[in-house]
Every structure is written in structure tokens, then in C-alpha cells.
Amino acid sequence: MKLTDSQKHLYSQYLAVTLIAVQFSFDTCVYLSSVVQYVKECGSDDPENYLFILQAVSAAVQVFFSFIIGDIASYVGSIKWVIIFLYFLSFVGNFLYSCAGAVSLNTLLGGRIICGAASSSGAVVYSYITAISKDRTTIFKLFSIYRTSAGICMALAQLVAILFALCDFTVRGYRITSYNAPTFASSFIILLICVLLMFVLENPPVKSARNPKNYLDAWKKFFSAGSNRLIASLILLWNMFLSTFFMCEVLYFMPIFLTLNVGWKTEYEGVAFMVSAVLGVAGSFFAPDLVKLFAKLNTPSTQDETDTSDNDKIEKEESEQKSDINTLHRNQVSLTIFALFVALIGQAFMIGASEALSNDKLPKTNSGIFFTAGLSITMLGYNFMGSSVPALFSMYIDPQVKVQLMPFIGAIAGVGKLVAPIVLAALYKTPLGLPIGVGFGMILVGISIPSLVYLRRNKM
């Protein structure tokens, strides 16, 4: 079957979005299963606290760059070359992180800071997607593919961690082990994909905005929107923050629980997170199908009209177009609400596994498996939201300032990555430990559902 030019172009867009997801996923996950042991190896006496510092500082840098990356792309006049530069930063950060054993403990932090800056690619991708397509359905599909690819790449990242965890050799006196070999491999994989992106990425036209007033005007347009539109945008930004917060529960508590409580090795942790990521991929993969399912369930039965004038037909077509937009909006909000309930189930599993282990109700291995099931379900909810929330947010943004403002949703996700380790570390130190940390996330999910019910009743 021969593909048409439009189909080739569409598949090229799919490939580009898939490749963009690699860096963000690898930087988030490859180091994760061995970080506690690596921190110990580099000389830290308090690996839990240093893990908090690594994640919080890296997230802070990501937040800072995510807020300004849209302005940088607008200033440069090219989203493509900004993404490629961020990929190169990721290569440098991972390589530096891998060399920490030969330099100092703080080299770990330096590498993660650079990777944090590179992870602002997770924000600029929203500008890229909305710049290369104007069709709302295609945009939602691209967001779903991005989240699906990110989930698959998270699983592949753990496969890299597992395979290279078997390494144990020296190069000119420097020892390559399971602690740094995966990030060495990751750095060169990212460099290779950086080269591929030079040929695959489109370079959509971006209006160069070198006057600082243009950035202020973009923010003024956002906050001067109608009250319904502004409230809806703020609700969606909150839910993007929330989705990242319970994603960070997975990233923060997984190495702590499985390493320090269950006692699993790096390879077993890698398998656990790979399973969670693969199962979580179903969230973004089936998101478009769920939206269609919600549409079928909510579509009222209509009777055919036999006699209609031309004017009536035109009015009917216009009415149907508005109805289609409102239906898509309503069904994507329904998907977001569904995602929150899925996340609640996963968080309940995580608490149950921790309580079962602490009260000797389950053996360590069984508790680890039960905890991994909770991780998987939570990741499923996260990926549902990762597909629906950005697509909804793009509906409320003025097309003239999308390049500058769409990364804002990635920046808010970065705020979630920054706040989560601070809050979770503080709660983990209390007598209740992990259960109160995860339980706090469940409370946030619970209080967020009414705002989405309100949003579902709104019309575009």
C-alpha cells in the first residue's frame, strides 16, 4: 500500500515527537534504580537526603528553563534548533554525572543540574506540537503519541539500566560499574538521537520576538482572557502540577522502598520500574480510544430531518462544528477525571504494600511486587492526564502566543517535580513515613475532582 504525501508527513511528525520523548524519559529514569548506591559509593553518609537534593535542585533548574524556553525559542526564531541544543545539554549532563566517581560527589549534582536544564525539552515540545498542526484532533493524537513514547522510553531506559548494570571493568584506572555504566550509555544514545533529530524535526515558522515587551504582552493576553477561560486554564495547570506530583511519588519512593525496605538489587528495581512504565503506557496509548468511547456514551440519539432549506443546512453545519468542539472538550475532561480515580487506586496499592511490610503481613518480595503494581496503576493515571491536559490547555490559548505560553504547562509540571521531593522528604521523616507521603497525594487528588466536574459543564 503506497502512502500519500499527507500520510508520510503525518508519520514523520509521529517519529519526531517519539524521538523528542527519548531524552526526557532517559534523563528521568536511567539513573533512578542505581542512584542510592551511587550516592553511597561517591561518599555520602545520608543518601536519602542527597537524593532529595539531587531531585529538587534538578527540578528547580528544569522549572526555571521551562518558564523561559518558549521566550528563547521565540527570540531565536526556531523551535527545532532549541530542541537540538537541549539534547546536546542532556548528553553533557549524563556524561558528567557518570564521571562523578572519579571527581567528587558534587559532580553528581552538576550533571543533574545540566540534565534539569535539558529536560525543559518536555515543555518546548508542547509549543512544537501546536506549531506543526492546527487540527485539534491531530494535536490530541500527537500529545497521546508523545506520552506513549515517553512511557515506552521509560521502560527502555530501565532496560538500558538493567543491561549495563552488568558492567564491571576499568578504563585507565576509572571503574565502570552498575552505578555509572547506564548513564554513560544513555549519554551516547541521546547524542545519536540528537543527530537524527537534525533531519527529522520540522522547523515550523516562528515569529521572532526580540522585544521584551512581546513576552509581557503574551502574559497579559493570558491573564486578560475572559473569566471562564482564565479559570479553566488555571484548573488545567493545577491538574498538570498534580499529575506530576503523583508521578514524583513513584520516582521518589520507588528507590527508597525497593532498595532500603525490600532490599532489591539494581537489576530488580530496573525490572520493577520497566514493568510499571510499560503498563503505564496503556494510559496514553488508549487515551484517544477512551475519548471516542466517552463520545459514544454521551452522544444523544437524533432523528433525521427530511425537509431542510439551504440556510438551515448551513446553520446546522455551523452548529455541528461547535458541538464537535464542545464534545471533544467534554470527553477529554471526562478522561482527566477518570485518570484521577485510576491514580487513587494506584496510590492505595502503594500504601497497602508499605503497611503490609511494616506489619509483617507479607514477605519482602511479595510487598515489592504489590508496591510495583501500585506504581503501574499510578503511572497509568499519569499517562492518561499527560495526554488530555495539554490538549485541553491548548484549546484555551490564543494561537498568536502559543509558542511562548504552551511551555508554561511543562513549567508547571516542573514545579510539581520541584515541590514533590521537598514535601515527600519532609513527610517521609515523620513517624508515618511513606503512607502519609502517598496519602497526601491522595488528598490532593480528591480535592481536585470537583473543579474538573465544573470544567466539564463549561462550553468552549
From Swiss-Prot:
Pfam families: MFS_1
UniProt KW keywords: Cell membrane, Ion transport, Iron, Iron transport, Membrane, Transmembrane, Transmembrane helix, Transport
Entry membrane topology: Multi-pass membrane protein
Molecular-function GO term, any one: transmembrane transporter activity
Residues passing through the membrane, by range: 16-36, 50-70, 81-101, 113-133, 151-171, 181-201, 240-260, 271-291, 333-353, 369-389, 408-428, 433-453
Gene disruption phenotype: Still produces pulcherrimin, but grows poorly when producing pulcherrimin.
GO CC annotations on file: plasma membrane
Record PANTHER family: INNER MEMBRANE TRANSPORT PROTEIN YAJR (PTHR23510), MAJOR FACILITATOR SUPERFAMILY DOMAIN-CONTAINING PROTEIN 8 (PTHR23510:SF3)
Protein name per Swiss-Prot or TrEMBL: MFS-type transporter PUL3
Organism of this sequence: Kluyveromyces lactis (strain ATCC 8585 / CBS 2359 / DSM 70799 / NBRC 1267 / NRRL Y-1140 / WM37) (Yeast)
Phylogenetic classification of the source organism: Eukaryota, Fungi, Dikarya, Ascomycota, Saccharomycotina
